[in-house]
A protein has these predicted regions:
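Walker A (P-loop) ATP-phosphate-binding motif of ABC ATPase nucleotide-binding domains
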Residues: 2
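Hydrophobic anchor at the beta1->P-loop junction of P-loop NTPases
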Residues: 5
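P-loop (Walker A) phosphate-binding loop of NTP-binding proteins
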Residues: 8
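Conserved lysine of the Walker
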Residues: 13
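Hydrophobic positions on the alpha1 helix immediately C-terminal to the Walker A/P-loop
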Residues: 16
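ATP-dependent small-molecule kinase phosphotransfer cores
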Residues: 27-86, 99-100, 111-116, 126-128
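Short, well-ordered beta-strand core segments
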Residues: 75, 92-94, 143
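Small-molecule kinase domains that catalyze NTP-dependent phosphoryl transfer to phosphate-bearing small molecules
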Residues: 114-143
Length: 143
């Protein structure tokens, strides 16, 4: 069984995907922008800005996630677009969270000021939604 778990930044995609993987014993596939940025030796936020202008980054990331998932009979794929890009998923889960909860989770993970995290999260949401519509014709605000 292939399980796809998606949600906006800070919704708990990684947390829930990890828990589902542990409970089921299925391998976790959670290859993200952070991983791709690390591979290329680029700061995460700089990499996000690059992706705003270069659709090939999203396309590569999503292609690699799907390839990893399709190599497994059973797996958990956690990513922002997993429920859309892994068409072969047997179960698709979309996580939602209020902006306040998401910002608090991101703040806990990344530190800095709460105000800064709020500003970055709003900006990231806008940019992600715009990119997903442009690249895939996906509206991640209406599930």
């Amino acid at each position: 069984m292939r399980i796809a778990i998606s949600g906006r930044s800070g919704c708990g995609n990684t947390t829930v995907s990890t828990l589902v993987s542990q409970i089921t014993g299925y391998p976790l596939i959670n290859f993200t922008f952070r991983n791709l940025a690390e591979e290329r030796g680029i700061d995460f936020w700089t990499f996000c800005k690059m992706a705003e202008r270069d659709d090939s980054i999203d396309l590569e990331l999503d292609r690699r996630q799907v390839e990893m998932a399709m190599e497994q009979k059973n797996c958990v794929l956690g990513s922002r677009l997993a429920i859309w890009v892994l068409k072969e998923a047997d179960l698709k889960v979309y996580l939602e969270g209020s902006l306040e909860v998401r910002v608090a989770r991101i703040h806990e993970r990344e530190g800095g000021s709460l105000e800064e995290r709020l500003k970055e999260t709003k900006r990231r949401d806008r940019k992600d939604t715009k990119r997903y519509k442009r690249i895939y014709s996906i509206d991640n605000t209406e599930i």
